[in-house]
Swiss-Prot record:
A motif (CysB motif) lies at residues 1348-1374. Residues 20-29 have a biased composition (Basic residues). The modification Phosphothreonine is found at residues 174, 406. PROSITE patterns: DNA_POLYMERASE_B. The gene is POLA1. It comes from Homo sapiens. A 165 kDa form is probably produced by proteolytic cleavage at Lys-124. The modification Phosphoserine is found at residues 186, 190, 209. PANTHER family: DNA POLYMERASE ALPHA CATALYTIC SUBUNIT. It catalyses: DNA(n) + a 2'-deoxyribonucleoside 5'-triphosphate = DNA(n+1) + diphosphate. This is DNA polymerase alpha catalytic subunit. A zinc finger (CysA-type) spans 1283-1318. Gene3D superfamilies: 2.40.50.730, 3.30.70.2820, DNA Polymerase alpha, zinc finger, DNA polymerase family B, C-terminal domain, Helix hairpin bin, Palm domain of DNA polymerase, Ribonuclease H-like superfamily/Ribonuclease H. It is linked to Pigmentary disorder, reticulate, with systemic manifestations, X-linked: An X-linked recessive disorder characterized by recurrent infections and sterile inflammation in various organs. Diffuse skin hyperpigmentation with a distinctive reticulate pattern is universally evident by early childhood. This is later followed in many patients by hypohidrosis, corneal inflammation and scarring, enterocolitis that resembles inflammatory bowel disease, and recurrent urethral strictures. Melanin and amyloid deposition is present in the dermis. Van Esch-O'Driscoll syndrome: An X-linked recessive syndrome characterized by different degrees of intellectual disability, moderate to severe short stature, microcephaly, hypogonadism, and variable congenital malformations.
Length: 1462
């Protein structure tokens, strides 16, 4: 019993703390008296207990004084340094047992962890109730549903913790060693702004006392599923409650039921945000006028504050709580007049290890009384394993593998399974029957049609090995088929739809956080309801801010904002506005404090922000809100890559209870996080679909990167400000800055939601899922392989086929032919870092490179590969192939044998039939779109559906050739591409027979040079070609894809063109189209792209050639000057490159700039880059001598580090120059040397590369023989030898020096005029120097350095890589160009020839044009002695040349294979 003290000091600080302090106080007098009593007791003297006289055990006070005392106790944190998260003092006396308010239970739970079940007198109960019983009490203790209580959530310790922290006042800037946090109550504030009791006006200057405990609630309180502790409560909000709803952060009556606060949160939010426009402007002004970080913020503050919400729906929206009776299911009458459970399923989950044979279906159910949909979970049990045993023809001995000659019957298979298999694997009970099944896949020796033994047994019993074989059966199928797959296939469920559950059962104990739960005891009780539109969903978009802890380098979550739409339609256009309510919560890092009077600023601004004292409180609040809002879809950016993992890790570290509220399934153990596949994170959210707009954007649009800022710019056409991670901590210094941080978080959530709506992600995902028949949450994760897999699974199941087991495709590849090894080794066709193609792909015709200024016609086959599959009936079921041959790789790189086309008389196979269905459905939808006066929503719905059908049909071919696909069939894929090549070549030949020139062709399209400038004639010609080609095929169709006014064709898959677009008035406009050029790739900086675009624009223009060259020259000179003088913005230098794997997985991280920048970004926290992400970096001068690739830095590093500057030479030489040089290659009058000169670069370094590319062609054409000596030896190193007399270095590059009459031998005199010595007197030294130089070059050759021919890479290595392309070893750094010898055999041979050439006096004299010159030189200089000296030096070079085999061809060896054996 807590005594009441009249002393003010006691009431101020709390009676309990004060009395305990006195009790522990010790004094000498007290010790002496105690010792004295002990001595007497030992002596046998009786100890008498002295009863003290207590005066005033109970103090009599009036009601007002008592209220003040209770309030003071509530305000006191009596546990030191607890931050209000562990204990709660509710301020009342222990003898208040007769009080009617349920908050008493919260007090008792806070002290001893037990919740008492009190009868509720004076509470009017609704018809739908759950009786009080002992089971309810235990469930309440476990956080489950409790007995019926009127608005009682006070038992939930977590909610008490959250509210306690929300109202904990920020500590002072210089806190004392031991802090005792105290809460102060604002004048005139309601004790709990979200209280269910009607708010009453309180005179200013007085504290509103709590509502009397003995009065019943003013309104009947129906039941509702509890948000935190599982209590069933329902609150009907009133207008008066909403009026009192402004959030008072320094208030908090913690004994109020938390669930009630949650209920009124949304209506309250609407009122608060409705008043926000004016205060928001003040926030902006404060930020602009501040100093330090504020000035930084001021530079990017928006014109209109985010708090200024212009959506009226947000202010008027009110969340209506739904009454749900957990003791009854919302049943409806079925077709047979029986009571059934109807629900719309959205997501499915199974736990194969802990709950085998059970599938959880999550979705929405209609509640008639509330006229709304609520979440539901249906537990489908007893899904049995289904296995198919293929009998052998003859029994075999498993030990020897030989047949015994005994024929097999189905009874023999049954007996072997019963007596051996079932016993061994402890399968106690099973069902079996013989069935007839078809098979059409890649396992050899499996008949097309056969009788199998079908065995069904409980999934709780062990799974059989996948490679199990027996004496009587050769194969067993279905061993690892999941319960979910079996359920979806057998019940023919294709994506989200309405389902009917017959004989639904109530669950004994809640398994999910859904409002309604049901159970189907067997899968046959679940049936599809067709042609009913989907219900609206609850969509929540969220964004969060993290900050890295400097000590442990962990990301801490400091702010979260979310926008919610409670009725988001999937079959209509996105709602406007896309959200109806919202919330925002902020915490502080452990080493920060909130700005002074932050809560008062929020209150003054009337901005609705929850303030959490700790990260644990913030996470608890977020989980509570997720549970309260109960979203079906959570939308974010980079959720799977970063945010979800961080969120779950922080929940785990902070030990926030009920982590599983992030999903819908109740679980205690969090899945393992941080795996490469993100499996744990995906499982954590089961029941709530995750829509990551980054993943969706990657599938639907093309951007240079998929960061939120880039998506906002590309899709929403607006700018997003980025707040650097290191600035966040500084923003806690002032309230205005912290408010801006929250505003930025809120706006990110809004951007994310708008991007999702703009891309129509959800309707498109729903349509694709319904077409493919997979699970929508997986569709939203991207990747088409699984969709194709499920589409084919449904088709083959329906046609009584046994389907390939999951992952069985890996075994044959590893067993047969070593295909994986060869692919990894990449012997032949390695391209762009990918594995070698397992079969030949599409045909690419050799381009006729050049610039075309006449109309070019582009013809294209519509959906070539799907059309070929239909045209020739190519299917698993129709094409005959030998499986063993189909899976082997032929030796010596020979092309694999292509299977024969199926017989035209065969029935259409399943694959072409499925594709035809998709094509026909798309045609029907497009016809529907042409109807007049259609509803815009319907038009959008049709458009999304036809887009989904197109995406699915076009990706169907991919599953054949994708080696990790379940339906991988390389022979079929090879046959399809073979026919594609054949058709393209046939089309080319047909066009050429029509006297037209085909200048290029690629896979499914050809370009025809019309040599015409009349557009009408061009279209006539195109239609003529089209009709001739289409006559040959039934389903294949070629069409005019476009007309180019002018075309710059550079090489295969690289061209630029002006596309003609006819207008309604008969004229046309042109649009620039680029294909495969550097300027459309993201790994070039914007400056290089802009320069390239300008050059292309000039080349494609109608100007004269001289004008074009002049304009390009001016622009390049200007760009070179701008780069050097620093007038180009840093953003123009940013290079973007995608990661093909996680940064830490790269073997050579230093040589790859984007990889080590990615590692730096990951080390900083705030975001995590992974495989598939795009990294931005700039190449800087940092004072080191490292290569350019090792001097890459993130743009934010360049801003922060003063010692970094842009490497201008790199950008001019390795970014701008290569781009322009490649574009201008076919243009006369512009070459690499000229471009280098215009850019201010040294032109000599580009000459080597300019001539290197033509060396091979020159050799074939006899080019070097036609060159002059000067041209032939222009790149050779000159012979240098110092004069032994004066030390001057003499350079020799010819036999002669000077010209005309001044011509003389180069060895005649020293280049130093003052030196009288002649080099001819030092021929021994010259010879020695020559030998040393030759040896140096030979050593350089044998060093074997290889260098990448790609100008932007220039990777240098001595290690010969294992991957080769047709032109040589593939560069391991860039994986797109070949490595060439840095010093080739030709270069060495030419250098040796040069040394012979400069000392070959006889040859030089012979080449003189006139006899007069020859005679003069011979008489004056070339005496026999001089000629002999020259000859000695020449012979020195010739000795080495004679050892070189470069210039010799051994004919006998060359033609050895042609010898005829006698």
């Amino acid at each position: 019993m807590a005594p009441v003290h009249g002393d003010d000091s006691l009431s101020d600080s709390g009676s309990f703390v004060s009395s305990r302090a006195r009790r522990e106080k010790k004094s000498k007098k007290g010790r002496q008296e105690a010792l004295e009593r002990l001595k007497k007791a030992k002596a046998g003297e009786k100890y008498k207990y002295e009863v003290e006289d207590f005066t005033g055990v109970y103090e009599e006070v009036d009601e007002e004084q008592y209220s003040k005392l209770v309030q003071a106790r509530q305000d006191d944190d009596w546990i030191v340094d607890d931050d209000g998260i562990g204990y709660v003092e509710d301020g009342r006396e222990i003898f208040d047992d007769d009080l009617e308010d349920d908050a008493l239970d919260a007090d008792e739970k806070g002290k001893d962890g037990k919740a008492r079940n009190k009868d509720k007198r004076n509470v009017k109960k609704l018809a739908v109730t759950k009786p009080n019983n002992i089971k309810s009490m235990f469930i309440a203790c476990a956080g489950k549903k409790t007995a019926d209580k009127a608005v009682d959530l006070s038992k939930d310790g977590l909610l008490g913790d959250i509210l306690q922290d929300l109202n904990t006042e920020t500590p002072q800037i210089t806190p004392p060693p031991v802090m005792i946090l105290k809460k102060k109550r604002s004048i005139g504030a309601s004790p709990n702004p979200f209280s269910v009791h009607t708010a009453t006006a309180v005179p200013s200057g007085k504290i509103a006392s709590p509502v009397s405990r003995k009065e019943p609630p003013l309104t009947p309180v129906p039941l509702k599923r509890a948000e935190f502790a599982g209590d069933d409560v329902q609150v009907e909000s009133t207008e008066e409650e909403q009026e009192s709803g402004a959030m008072e952060f320094e208030d908090g009556d913690f004994d109020e039921p938390m669930e009630v606060e949650e209920v009124d949160l949304e209506p309250m939010a609407a009122k608060a945000w409705d008043k926000e426009s004016e205060p928001a402007e003040e926030v902006k002004q404060e930020a602009d006028s501040g100093k330090g970080t504020v000035s930084y913020l001021g530079s990017f503050l928006p014109d209109v504050s985010c708090w200024d919400i212009d959506q009226e729906g947000d202010s008027s929206f009110s969340v209506q709580e739904v009454q749900v009776d957990s003791s009854h299911l919302p049943l409806v009458k079925g077709a047979d007049e029986e009571q059934v459970f109807h629900f719309y399923w959205l997501d499915a989950y199974e736990d194969q290890y802990n709950q085998p044979g059970v599938v959880f279906l999550f979705g929405k159910v209609w509640i008639e009384s509330a006229e709304t949909h609520v979440s539901c979970c249906v537990m489908v049990k007893n899904i049995e394993r289904t296995l198919y045993f293929l009998p052998r023809e003859m029994k075999i001995d498993l030990n020897t593998g030989k047949e015994t000659g005994t024929p097999i019957s189905m009874k023999d298979v049954y007996e072997e399974f019963d007596e051996k298999i079932a016993t061994k694997y402890k399968i106690m009970k099973f069902k079996s029957k013989p069935v007839e099944k078809n098979y059409a896949f890649e396992i050899p020796d499996v008949p097309e049609k056969s009788e199998y033994l079908e065995v069904k047994y409980s999934a709780e019993m062990p799974q059989l090995p996948q490679d199990l074989k027996g004496e009587t059966f050769s194969h067993v199928f279905g061993t690892n088929t999941s319960s979910l797959e079996l359920f979806l296939m057998n019940r023919k469920i294709k994506g989200p739809c309405w389902l009917e559950v017959k004989s639904p059962q109530l669950l004994n104990q809640p398994v999910s956080w859904c409002k309604v739960e049901a159970m189907a005891l067997k899968p046959d009780l679940v049936n599809v309801i067709k042609d009913v539109s989907p219900p609206p969903l609850v969509v929540m978009a969220f964004s969060m801010k993290t900050m890295q802890n400097a000590k442990n380098h962990q990301n801490e979550i400091i702010a979260m904002a979310a926008l919610v739409h409670h009725s988001f339609a999937l079959d209509k256009a996105a709602p406007k506005p896309p959200f109806q309510s919202h919330f925002c919560v902020v915490s502080k890092p452990k080493d920060c404090i909130f700005p002074y009077a932050f809560k008062e600023v929020i209150e003054k601004k009337n901005v609705k922000v929850e303030v959490a004292a700790t990260e644990r409180t913030l996470l608890g609040f977020f989980l509570a809100k997720v549970h309260k809002i109960d979203p079906d879809i959570i939308v974010g950016h980079n959720i799977y890559g970063f945010e979800l993992e961080v969120l779950l890790q922080r929940i785990n570290v902070c030990k926030a209870p009920h982590w599983s509220k992030i999903g819908r399934l109740k679980r205690s153990n969090m899945p393992k996080l941080g795996g490469r596949s993100g499996f744990g994170e995906r499982n954590a959210t089961c029941g709530r679909m995750i829509c990551d707009v980054e993943i969706s954007a990657k599938e639907l649009i093309r951007c240079k990167s998929y960061h939120l800022s880039e998506l906002v710019q590309q899709i929403l056409k607006t700018e997003r400000v980025v707040i650097p991670m290191e600035n966040i901590q500084n923003m806690y210094s002032e309230s205005s800055q912290l408010l801006y941080l929250l505003e930025h978080t809120w706006k990110d959530a809004k951007f994310i939601l708008q991007i999702m709506c703009e891309l129509n992600v959800l309707p498109l995902a729903l349509q694709i899922t319904n077409i493919a028949g997979n699970i929508m949450s997986r569709t939203l994760m991207g990747g088409r392989s699984e969709r194709n897999e499920f589409l084919l699974l449904h088709a083959f199941y329906e046609n009584n086929y046994i389907v390939p087991d999951k992952q069985i495709f890996r075994k044959p590849q590893q067993k047969l032919g070593d295909e994986d090894e060869e692919i990894d080794g990449d012997t032949n066709k390695y391209k762009k870092g990918r594995k070698k193609a397992a079969y030949a792909g599409g045909l690419v015709l050799d381009p006729k490179v050049g610039f075309y200024d006449k109309f070019i016609l582009l013809l294209d086959f519509n959906s070539l590969y799907p059309s070929i599959i239909q045209e020739f009936n190519i299917c698993f079921t129709t094409v005959q192939r030998v499986a063993s041959e189909a899976q082997k790789v032929t030796e010596d790189g020979e092309q694999e044998q292509i299977p024969e086309l199926p017989d035209p008389s065969l029935e259409m196979g399943i694959l072409p039939r499925e594709i035809r269905k998709l094509v026909e459905r798309r045609k029907q939808v497009k016809q529907l779109m042409k109807q007049q006066d259609l509803n815009p929503d319907l038009i959008l719905q049709y458009d999304i559906r036809q887009k989904a059908l197109k995406l699915t049909a076009n990706s169907m071919y991919g599953c054949l050739g994708f080696s990790y696909s379940r339906f991988y069939a390389k022979p079929l894929a090879a046959l399809v591409t073979y026919k594609g090549r054949e058709i393209l070549m046939h089309t080319k030949e047909m066009v050429q027979k029509m006297n037209l020139e085909v200048i290029y062709g690629d896979t499914d399209s050809i370009m025809i040079n019309t040599n015409s400038t009349n557009l009408e004639e061009v279209f006539k010609l195109g239609n003529k070609v089209k009709s001739e080609v289409n006559k040959l095929y039934k389903l294949l169709e070629i069409d005019i894809d476009g007309v180019f006014k002018s075309l710059l064709l550079l090489k295969k898959k690289k061209y630029a063109a002006l596309v003609v677009e006819p207008t309604s008035d008969g004229n046309y406009v042109t649009k620039q189209e680029l294909k495969g050029l550097d300027i459309v790739r993201r790994d070039w900086c914007d400056l290089a792209k802009d320069t390239g675009n300008f050059v292309i624009g000039q080349i494609l223009s109608d100007q004269s050639r001289d004008t074009i060259v002049e304009n390009i020259q001016k622009r390049l000179i200007e760009i070179g000057e701008n780069v050097l003088n620093g007038s180009v913005p840093v953003s123009q230098f940013e290079i973007n490159k995608a990661l093909t794997k996680d940064p830490q997985d790269y073997p050579d991280k230093k040589s790859l700039p984007h990889v080590h920048v990615a590692l730096w970004i990951n080390s900083q926290g705030g975001r995590k880059v992974k495989a598939g992400d795009t990294v931005s970096y700039v190449i800087c001068q940092d004072g080191s001598n490292l290569t350019a690739s090792q001097r890459a830095y993130a743009p934010e590093q360049l801003q922060k580090q003063d010692n970094l500057t842009i490497d201008t030479q790199y950008y001019l030489a390795q970014q701008i120059h290569p781009v322009v040089a490649r574009i201008c290659e076919p243009i006369d009058g512009i070459d690499a040397v000229l471009i280098a000169t215009w850019l201010g670069l040294d032109p000599t370094q580009f000459r080597v590369h300019h001539y290197h590319k033509d060396e091979e062609n020159d050799a074939l054409l006899g080019g070097p023989a036609q060159l002059t000596d000067e041209e032939k030896y222009r790149d050779c190193e000159r012979f240098k030898c110092p004069c032994p007399t004066c030390g001057t270095e003499n350079i020799y590059d010819n036999v002669f020096d000077g010209s005309g009459t001044d011509m003389e031998p180069s060895l005649y005199r020293c280049s130093n005029i003052d030196c009288k010595a002649s080099p001819l007197t030092f021929t021994v030294q010259l010879s020695n120097k020559l030998i040393m130089d030759i040896r140096r070059f030979i050593k350089k050759y044998y060093d074997g350095w290889l260098i990448c021919e790609e100008p932007t890479c220039r990777n240098r290595t001595r290690h010969l890589p294992l991957q080769f392309s047709r032109t040589g070893p593939l560069c391991p750094a860039c994986m797109k160009a070949t490595l060439q010898p840095e010093y080739s055999d030709k270069s060495l041979y030419t250098q040796l020839c040069f040394y012979r050439y400069i000392f070959d006096a006889e040859c030089a004299l012979e080449k003189l044009t006139t006899d007069h010159e020859k005679d003069k030189l011979k008489k004056q200089f070339f005496t026999p002695k001089v000629l002999q000296d020259y000859r000695k030096l020449k012979n020195t070079a010739e000795q080495f040349l004679s050892r070189s085999g470069y210039s010799e061809v051994n004919l006998s060896k060359l033609f050895a294979g042609c010898a005829v054996k006698s």
